Regions:
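Catalytic-site beta-strand/loop segments enriched in glycine and acidic/polar residues
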Residues: 1-6, 141
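Short active-site segment of divalent metal-dependent hydrolases/proteases
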Residues: 5-6, 10, 145, 149
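A glycine/threonine-rich phosphate-anchoring loop and its flanking beta-alpha core
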Residues: 10-102
Length: 261
């Protein structure tokens, strides 16, 4: 199945008898490039994303691209969220996606980029099995994505990730000396995959939920993994007030540009 099935099954395998073997057979694009790889399984609890979970590597992962033919367009967009996130962390993958930005949902392209994505994430996980050090790069775009998701939950995970990358690219321009030309291209990739910025809930509500994110050291700050240059990221710590004000300003920027948020 998809990410939910993989998370529930993987967590059950990690807990039952203190851990039994698990085989992941992901059937969605998102699950193939992200959730089935890395051994991180979790469920939401008390209104917080992925609060209860475990790290346990699956025995095998079988990723078959023929499943893509069964997916509706929205499930493809969902998977593109994690694919473009990996592109923000890998210069080679970014160049591939940018060169083919007019056909991001093409089946042949997806079949070609899925192995690249799996290899990229597997290497990150090999070097940092838990959510410390290098593996923190995989949180890129996710703080804001999770905050919007918890606020209204009307979009898929990957759609929120695409929006989250756009917002956090804007934070990188403002607070992390991000390369404006590169970040504009990254935002264009995300918006192309989305078909435009979707309707999003009020920024003030999302900001309040972002301060509950487990990556934060205190409720008075928000920690983001932001893209700064091609293949480079940075951990950016903002005060809650900075984050809340920035989220509102960025949302207004897209609204003023004629894009509904």
């Amino acid at each position: 199945g998809g990410g939910v099935v993989g998370d529930i099954g993987g967590l059950a395998a990690a807990l039952y008898m203190r851990g039994i073997d698990c085989i992941q057979i992901p059937t969605t694009l998102l699950a193939q490039v992200d959730s089935s790889v890395g051994g991180k399984t979790a469920v939401d609890f008390a209104g917080v994303k992925n609060l209860i979970g475990a790290f346990r590597q699956p025995r095998y992962v079988f990723a078959d691209p023929t499943f893509f033919a069964t997916l509706p367009p929205r499930e493809v967009r969902c998977g593109l969220g994690e694919i473009i996130k990996h592109g923000a962390l890998s210069a080679e993958l970014f160049d591939l996606l940018w060169a083919h930005r007019s056909r991001l949902a093409d089946g042949e392209l997806l079949a070609a980029v899925v192995p690249e994505n799996i290899a990229f994430k597997a290497e990150v996980v090999r070097r940092a099995a838990t959510e410390k050090g290098l593996r923190k790069c995989l949180n890129l775009g996710h703080t804001t994505a999770h905050a919007f998701d918890l606020t209204d939950g009307k979009l898929s995970h990957g759609e929120y990730v695409l929006a989250g990358i756009v917002f956090e690219a804007e934070f990188a321009k403002r607070y992390a000396d991000g390369d404006a030309e590169y970040l504009a291209k990254l935002e264009e990739l995300c918006l192309t995959a989305l078909g435009g910025m979707p309707a999003l809930p009020p920024a003030k509500d999302a900001a309040r939920l972002a301060r509950l994110d487990k990556k934060n050291a205190s409720p008075d700050e928000v920690v983001l993994t932001v893209p700064v240059r091609k293949g480079e990221y940075r951990l950016l710590t903002l005060s809650y007030d900075e984050y809340a004000a920035g989220l509102e300003e960025i949302r207004n920027k897209f609204t003023a540009g004629g894009v509904q948020c």
